[in-house]
C-alpha cells in the first residue's frame, strides 16, 4: 500500500478540492488533525471494515462525495490496514478486524439540528455502498454512531472476543457503571 502519485492525481482531478491533505501521515500528524474540529459540532460517522476496495465501489464513493448533497462537511475516510494492526496474534487484543484491508467510514459533520436528517442520511448512504464488501458486518467501534445496533458492535469484535469482553464486563463492571460508550452489557 503506499503513496501512489497516479491515484492521488486522479483524486485531485476528479473531485472538487476544498482542502488537500492527501498523502502519507505519521501517527502523530494524524492525531493532531482532531484539533481542527471545534467543540459543538454534530457528528455522524458510520462505516465498515473491508476485505478489499474494488474499482466500482470506489467510483460510487467518488460520485457520492461529488454529489455534495450532505450539509456541512462530508468526508469519506479510507484507512488502509497495514503493519501491526494486521499482525497481532489472533485473540491477542479486543480489535477483531485483523483480516481487513480497509476501514471505510463516512464522516458527516454539521452545525444545525435542522440538518440532522440530511447529514445522517448521507452517511448511511455511504455505509450502504460499502456494506456488500464488509468483512464482518461491523465497523470501527470508536467511530460508531450513537444509534449503532448491538449486532454491528458485536460483529466488530467477533464472537470469541465478544465472549471475552462480556466476561471482563461481568467481573469488573457488573453494575454497568461504564455504560456511556457503545455498551457491552454485563448480563
Question: Residues of each region from the PLM?
Answer:
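Soluble FAD-dependent oxygen oxidases
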Residues: 1-187
Amino acid at each position: 500500500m503506499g503513496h501512489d502519485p497516479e491515484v492521488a492525481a486522479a483524486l485531485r482531478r476528479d473531485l472538487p478540492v476544498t482542502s488537500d491533505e492527501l498523502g502519507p501521515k505519521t501517527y502523530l500528524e494524524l492525531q493532531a488533525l482532531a484539533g481542527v474540529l471545534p467543540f459543538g459540532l454534530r457528528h455522524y460517522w458510520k462505516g465498515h471494515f473491508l476485505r478489499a476496495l474494488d474499482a466500482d465501489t470506489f467510483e460510487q464513493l467518488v460520485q457520492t462525495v461529488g454529489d455534495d448533497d450532505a450539509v456541512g462537511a462530508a468526508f469519506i475516510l479510507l484507512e488502509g490496514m497495514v503493519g501491526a494492526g494486521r499482525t497481532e496474534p489472533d485473540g491477542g487484543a479486543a480489535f477483531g478486524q485483523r483480516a481487513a484491508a480497509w476501514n471505510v467510514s463516512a464522516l458527516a459533520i454539521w452545525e444545525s439540528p435542522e440538518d440532522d436528517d440530511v447529514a445522517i442520511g448521507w452517511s448511511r448512504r455511504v455505509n450502504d455502498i460499502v456494506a456488500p464488501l464488509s468483512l464482518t458486518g461491523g465497523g470501527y467501534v470508536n467511530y460508531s454512531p450513537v444509534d449503532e445496533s448491538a449486532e454491528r458492535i458485536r460483529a466488530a469484535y467477533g464472537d470469541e472476543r465478544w465472549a471475552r469482553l462480556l466476561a471482563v464486563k461481568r467481573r469488573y463492571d457488573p453494575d454497568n457503571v461504564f455504560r456511556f460508550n457503545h455498551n457491552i452489557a454485563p448480563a
